Regions:
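Alpha/beta enzyme core
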Residues: 1-47, 51-71, 75-186
């Protein structure tokens, strides 16, 4: 899979990704930090895009720093669409907080059109209520089920350029979750 000009997965070398931690409204600060990360050997940079006004940050960073850029989107699917139009190289969403299926479909469609991968981010601290009701608390099986549910939702809209990310403060739980996902995916 390609994230801009960086290949990830299978036999590719490990790509280093970092996330900018400057407020989105500080465009120059973000550009400076992105340049420092690239100089330090970072391969991919993720940036939070908290609102539509912040999409300008994507254009600015892309014009100053030649590095694949991942837009981290929460809650508003329109931000993901605008970031895709701004030339972002990957979009990180949690389909469970983007809205109903029509909104997930809109993001999948624009990403398909522009060949932009979508990273599904699943976190043990923010599992869906239905999954927590089933498992009672975060478990590797719960994290796996959430990730695969969201992947299946994207696949329902003919989107298969998917990266799965699972996070937990419990390292053993996280590793077991990845093992379960790997067993169920090709």
């Amino acid at each position: 899979m390609n994230i801009g000009n960086v290949c990830i997965g299978k036999d590719e070398k490990i790509a280093v990704q970092s996330m900018l931690n400057i407020p989105a409204h500080d465009i120059q600060g973000n550009i400076d930090q992105a340049m420092k990360l690239k100089a330090a050997g970072c391969d991919i940079i993720r940036v939070a895009v908290p609102n539509l006004e912040s999409v300008e940050l994507i254009y600015k960073i892309k014009s100053f720093v030649d590095i694949p850029l991942v837009a981290d989107i929460h809650f508003d699917y329109k931000i993901a669409i605008e970031c895709a139009n701004a030339g972002v190289d990957k979009i990180r969403i949690n389909p469970g907080n983007i809205g109903d299926d029509s909104r997930v479909e809109a993001v999948a469609n624009i990403c398909n059109e522009k060949n932009i991968p979508i990273r599904i981010g699943v976190n043990s601290g923010s599992l869906e209520k239905e999954i927590l009701a089933k498992y009672l608390h975060p478990t590797p099986e719960a994290l796996c089920e959430s990730a695969l549910y969201h992947a299946a939702l994207l696949e329902k809209f003919d989107f298969d350029n998917i990266v799965i990310s699972i996070k937990s403060s419990n390292v053993n739980m996280m590793v077991k979750s990845y093992e379960l996902v790997a067993d169920r995916c090709n």
